[in-house]
Regions:
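A structural signal for short, hydrophobic/glycine-enriched beta-strand patches
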Residues: 1-170
Length: 170
């Protein structure tokens, strides 16, 4: 079915979810680094997905992105720093965490993550990364990452599964 052929009365929540979110499923592969994109709610929604993958042995490195300063209950921190503190509390080893504290938006999250990956792990030694963000943010984030990352690095989506009807209704 072509999207251009869909009539308004044919739209269902399930069809909208399928159109927006198909082909962004996690493959379950092991990777060289897990990249978590920043947001004010990244610690609540995105970080647990990354930590689950880390504890499952899919990677021993996590890059936390987000330089935007936010007011959290414990004080004002960058998004990445707030995730860092939570990651330590959830059993991630300090030496397995990298912070990208400069970015202010999705494009910068990915650009500056590349810089940090080069500085810490060397891009030529990286073959696969796991990109963690919310489901509704994944298609755009994945397109940006696949455009900006070197061709030899496979970017695997790992969406935090919130479907559009859950975001609207719940």
């Amino acid at each position: 079915m072509l999207v251009s052929k869909i009539q308004e009365n044919d739209l269902t929540i399930e069809l909208i979810d399928r159109l927006l979110f198909q082909e962004i499923e996690d493959t379950g592969e092991n990777v060289d680094c897990i990249i978590v994109l920043g947001s004010i709610k990244a610690t609540k929604y995105r970080l647990p997905i990354a930590i689950e993958a880390y504890h499952a042995g899919r990677s021993n490195k996590i890059m936390l992105c987000g330089g935007k300063l936010r007011d959290f209950p414990t004080g004002q921190y960058s998004e990445a720093t707030h995730m860092y503190e939570s990651a330590l509390d959830l059993g991630v080893a300090k030496e397995d965490l990298f912070l990208e504290n400069s970015s202010l938006n999705t494009v910068e999250n990915i650009l500056y993550a590349l810089v940090e990956l080069q500085r810490t792990l060397w891009l030529n030694k990286i073959n696969k990364v796991l990109l963690v963000t919310t489901t509704y943010h994944m298609r755009r984030s994945l397109a940006i990452a696949r455009y900006l990352f070197p061709a030899h690095i496979t970017v695997i989506p790992c969406p935090q599964m919130i479907l559009i009807h859950e975001k609207i209704i719940g």
